[in-house]
Amino acid sequence: MLAELSLHPKNLWVGVGCQKGNSRDLIEAAIAHVFREHQLSQNAIAGLASIDTKVDEVGLVELCREQNWLLKTFPAEILRTVCVPNPSQLIHKHIATPSVAEAAALYAAECKSLLVTKQIFRPAIKDQKGTVTIAIAQAS
């Protein structure tokens, strides 16, 4: 029996929107869930992308460090210029851009369309709090 070999170029950018203080485990679970649901390999992740206010977000920073992923962050002024399929007025009201996950993924990947539109992940465990929004774009 021959072993199967799969090669994955690191060309997927994962846009992440999350509440302040979300744990590394919660963010990791959200990414794993979305990748599993869409039959994508996490080995193809180039990095995570978010709004610049998350540049020191412990959960994001820890996950990127452990996985050896890049973390790109962008100011709201840039993210709000990105055309996204699912803008949110609620998000716009709070952080001055209608999108974080979708806009950050698109901007990081330097592309115009998403591989996976925003997916909102909430933990199944009642004691674990937080919400993570994930979107995925593929760089060329």
Placement of each model-derived feature along the sequence:
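C-terminal edge-of-domain segments
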Residues: 6-8, 105-140
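Conserved mixed alpha/beta catalytic, RNA-binding, or beta-rich assembly cores of soluble enzyme
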Residues: 1-54, 137-140
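Long, charge-dense
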Residues: 51, 56, 60-100
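Short low-complexity stretches enriched in small and charged residues
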Residues: 2-6, 70-72, 89-90, 107
